[in-house]
């Protein structure tokens, strides 16, 4: 966020990369996309140098992080094809929060038997976990106010990531849109229904939904079908990747109210599905190739 550093990266990427030693971590690198071609040159030269000296391959020279996957994925894959590994980072899983070993969620009988030995939580304890969410800062800082955190998160998300993609006058509509999606988490996607009361077209809603999916806010779970054409025609189900954020946007501020609400089934389903999705991602697997819903 240092504007002088960002200016150097944008205006003179070659000097920027010479200024800092490797391994180098570059945060929010999508703001300086010109860096990618110079990083490619450095990586290729380093590989050639190692090859001549009979050294092992060089990995981990640069760590690029970005919150705007819709930009970073395209630029990175085009500029650094064959030279990168892309990792999606989501909120904490329940196993991570409980300091348990990361484990892929699969319907295996032996795994299910082991789960019998785990602690059985009360319903209210489960909804307290759900409404708190999975963002690391909420667990790192025990004194942080959950509602204040989500308010700041949404404001920062819109001001930093979204403002570049939508008209400034549409920000209030976008907030209403994301709240409408939150209310419908766990349901089949109905664009027209989401648009109700906002005053946006279906085309705008589809664009904004694409932004939410590409920034990791929501996930579209496709229906299962052995017919690819039928799968395309059927509607996906939309899930928030952080159930706590969905609760905040839907207006639920405490676990007791959430537990007694008509929203409890959909948000519980959202919590479980997001845990399953994250278990695949954390094991280096593309969830879209393995997970579907069946009706």
Predicted regions and their residues:
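Short glycine-rich substrate-engagement loop in P-loop NTPases that contacts/grips substrate
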Residues: 1-23
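Catalytic P-loop NTPase motifs of RecA-like helicase/translocase cores
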Residues: 3-6, 31-33, 71-72
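Conserved P-loop NTPase "ATPase switch" module shared by AAA+ and STAND
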Residues: 18-38
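Hydrophobic "anchor" residues on beta-strands that sit immediately upstream
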Residues: 23-24, 63, 292
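Conserved catalytic/switch belt of AAA+ P-loop NTPases
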Residues: 36-68, 77-79
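Short mixed-charge
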Residues: 48-57, 110-115, 290
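Interdomain motor-coupling "hinge/lid" segment immediately C-terminal to the ATP-binding subdomain
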Residues: 59, 69, 73-183, 187-188
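Accessory nucleic acid-recognition modules appended to NTPase machines
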Residues: 139-295
């Amino acid at each position: 966020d240092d504007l002088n550093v960002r200016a150097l990266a944008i205006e003179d990427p070659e000097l920027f990369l010479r200024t800092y030693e490797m391994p180098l971590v570059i945060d929010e690198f999508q703001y300086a996309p010109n860096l990618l071609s110079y990083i490619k040159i450095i990586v290729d030269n380093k590989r050639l140098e190692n090859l001549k000296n009979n050294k092992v391959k060089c990995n981990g020279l640069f760590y690029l992080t970005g919150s705007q996957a819709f930009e970073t994925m395209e630029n990175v894959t085009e500029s650094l094809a064959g030279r990168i590994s892309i990792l999606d980072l989501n909120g904490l899983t329940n196993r991570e929060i409980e300091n348990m070993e990361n484990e892929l969620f699969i319907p295996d009988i032996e795994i299910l038997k082991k789960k019998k030995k785990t602690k059985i939580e009360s319903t209210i304890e489960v909804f307290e976990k759900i409404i708190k969410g999975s963002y690391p800062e909420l667990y790192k800082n025990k004194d942080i106010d959950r509602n204040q955190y989500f308010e700041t998160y949404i404001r920062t998300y819109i001001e930093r990531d979204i403002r570049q993609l939508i008209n400034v006058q549409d920000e209030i509509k976008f907030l209403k849109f994301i709240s409408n999606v939150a209310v419908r988490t766990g349901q089949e996607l109905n664009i027209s229904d989401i648009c109700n009361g906002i005053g946006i077209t279906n085309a705008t809603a589809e664009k904004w939904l694409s932004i939410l999916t590409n920034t990791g806010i929501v996930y579209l779970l496709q229906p299962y079908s052995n017919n690819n054409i039928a799968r395309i025609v059927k509607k996906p189900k939309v899930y928030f990747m952080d159930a706590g954020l969905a609760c905040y946007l839907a207006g639920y501020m405490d676990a007791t109210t959430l537990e007694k609400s008509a929203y409890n089934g959909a948000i519980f389903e959202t919590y479980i599905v997001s845990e399953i999705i994250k278990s695949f991602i954390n094991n280096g697997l593309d969830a879209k190739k393995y997970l579907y819903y069946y009706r």
